[in-house]
Curated annotation (Swiss-Prot):
Mg(2+) binds at residues 201, 203-204. Its EC number is 4.1.1.39. The modification N6-carboxylysine is found at residue 201. One of its GO terms (cellular component) is chloroplast. The record marks 334 as: Transition state stabilizer. This is Ribulose bisphosphate carboxylase large chain. The active site is at 175 (proton acceptor), 294 (proton acceptor). Belongs to the RuBisCO large chain family. Type I subfamily. The basic functional RuBisCO is composed of a large chain homodimer in a 'head-to-tail' conformation. In form I RuBisCO this homodimer is arranged in a barrel-like tetramer with the small subunits forming a tetrameric 'cap' on each end of the 'barrel'. GO terms for biological process: photorespiration; reductive pentose-phosphate cycle. It catalyses: 2 (2R)-3-phosphoglycerate + 2 H(+) = D-ribulose 1,5-bisphosphate + CO2 + H2O; D-ribulose 1,5-bisphosphate + O2 = 2-phosphoglycolate + (2R)-3-phosphoglycerate + 2 H(+). The disulfide bond which can form in the large chain dimeric partners within the hexadecamer appears to be associated with oxidative stress and protein turnover.
Length: 477
């Protein structure tokens, strides 16, 4: 290379490696209303300052890379870079910090949860300078929210479709989840629906296996729905799982469900993927189907406190991608979930405007600008003795789903469903009369047993069943 060429190449560009914090740590930055804001729990490697760690997260999840590149001069880094604008220590932890990062809106494709996550959590979580990294929360600005359709229908439209008001909805996951023939599966659905439930449900891993192909299941479940509706005079539904190996097959299953005239289908949104989920949500809105969402695989991502992504982020992403129901834990059942934290993301699913509230794990004020809400589903290890607590915790706009708590009734599925319906009606009536469900719950259930032998039998079976384990993921005190 001639000296002349060498001189020209070096003008305005100095090769080498420089600290991330020189470019991406900007504590003086004032966030914009259009920025996507992220709160990361950062655990740096020994010797890495929190400012450098936070700046590295901002850089590697936006415009930065490990070395200076000459093409930086071909764009405006100041316009497009992510910025770590605030750092605070985590209470009770010596080597963890909450690092706040602001991302310009131009970094993200409109209406794409897939692209948003690919940027914010796609690559940086494997960064060697960090021992662990967790995305605790996101603030989605109205300017980005309005590029999404959101839930196919929302809470009010669902209630109008079902003609059911003033109480939580009741559901049941059919068990055993695998191994039943389509006809026996449909029979189990029918017994639950005629007994008083609003919905029955495919479990997350019921797709189209050799023992029960999807088309056969759809037909027998539709028959169960129509027969139960004729007997009870109520609108019934079964969450027909449309999750499949390809998007094309998934849509084909949803089309068949619509042709059968059933009210609702289902999708496993994490294993199925956000692109598939958004496609299905659009189809459901266009064709009048409600969409139930299962969160299978979520705990792989959100269970550990110092690494991964909190479920409140997955819940926000689902509301944007689209779903009318989503499983949200129970607080009192067999699955992980602290009460205040669970109520925090339940509000993020249902409400239009949610204030920042660190006591409930909410790091940012979130304005959904009239995007429809999602109904939280409480499911997993719950039974009739839990009904007062569930009614008090989740309120009317929820689905309370009893799988074993229905099918495990000693007299069969229909009596199990009747027991749950009587318990729910008793709790709702007591609440409406001003009684304290948290304090008087057991008394309310015992009183209802006098009028319902099905409930009395259920109470006897599950009187000693408890799941008393401390949650792994808790709010920082």
């Amino acid at each position: 290379m001639s000296p002349q060429t060498e001189t020209k190449a070096s003008v305005g560009f100095k090769a080498g490696v420089k600290d991330y914090k020189l470019t991406y740590y900007t504590p003086e930055y004032e966030t914009k209303d259009t920025d996507i804001l992220a709160a990361f729990r950062v655990s740096p490697q020994p010797g890495v300052p929190p400012e450098e760690a936070g700046a590295a997260v901002a850089a590697e999840s936006s415009t930065g890379t490990w070395t200076t590149v000459w093409t930086d001069g071909l764009t405006s880094l100041d316009r497009y870079k992510g910025r770590c604008y605030h750092i605070e220590p985590v209470a009770g932890e010596d080597s963890q910090w909450i690092c706040y990062v602001a991302y310009p809106l131009d970094l993200f494709e409109e209406g794409s949860v897939t692209n948003m996550f690919t940027s914010i959590v796609g690559n940086v979580f494997g960064f060697k300078a960090l021992r662990a990294l967790r995305l605790e929360d996101l603030r989605i600005p109205p300017a980005y929210t309005k590029t999404f359709q959101g839930p196919p229908h929302g809470i009010q439209v669902e209630r109008d479709k079902l003609n059911k008001y003033g109480r939580p909805l009741l559901g049941c996951t059919i068990k055993p989840k695998l191994g039943l023939s389509a006809k026996n599966y449909g029979r189990a659905c029918y017994e639950c629906l005629r007994g008083g439930l609003d919905f029955t449900k495919d479990d997350e891993n019921v797709n189209s296996q050799p023992f029960m192909r999807w088309r056969d299941r759809f037909v027998f479940c539709a028959e169960a729905i129509y027969k139960a509706q004729a007997e009870t005079g109520e609108i019934k539904g079964h969450y027909l799982n449309a999750t499949a190996g390809t998007c094309e097959e998934m849509i084909k299953r949803a089309v068949f469900a619509r042709e059968l005239g059933v009210p609702i289908v289902m999708h496993d949104y994490i294993t199925g993927g956000f692109t598939a989920n958004t496609s299905l949500a659009h189809y459901c809105r266009d064709n009048g189907l409600l969409l139930h969402i299962h969160r299978a695989m979520h705990a792989v991502i959100d269970r550990q406190k110092n690494h991964g992504m909190h479920f409140r982020v997955l819940a926000k992403a689902l509301r944007m991608s689209g779903g009318d129901h989503i499983h949200a834990g129970t607080v009192v059942g067999k699955l992980e979930g602290e009460r205040e934290m669970t109520l925090g993301f339940v509000d993020l699913l249902r409400d239009d405007f949610i204030e920042k509230d660190r006591a409930r794990g909410i790091f940012f004020t979130q304005d959904w600008v009239s995007m429809p809400g999602v109904i939280p589903v409480a499911s997993g290890g719950i039974h009739v003795w839990h009904m007062p607590a569930l009614t008090e915790i989740f309120g009317d706009d929820s689905v309370l789903q009893f799988g074993g708590g229905t099918l495990g009734h000693p007299w069969g599925n229909a009596p199990g469903a009747a027991a749950n319906r009587v318990a729910l009606e008793a709790c709702v009536q007591a609440r409406n009369e001003g009684r304290d469900l948290a304090r008087e719950g057991n008394e309310i259930i015992r009183a209802a047993c006098k009028w319902s032998p099905e409930l009395a039998a259920a109470c006897e079976v599950w009187k000693a069943i408890k799941f008393e384990f401390e949650p792994v993921d808790t709010i920082d005190k």
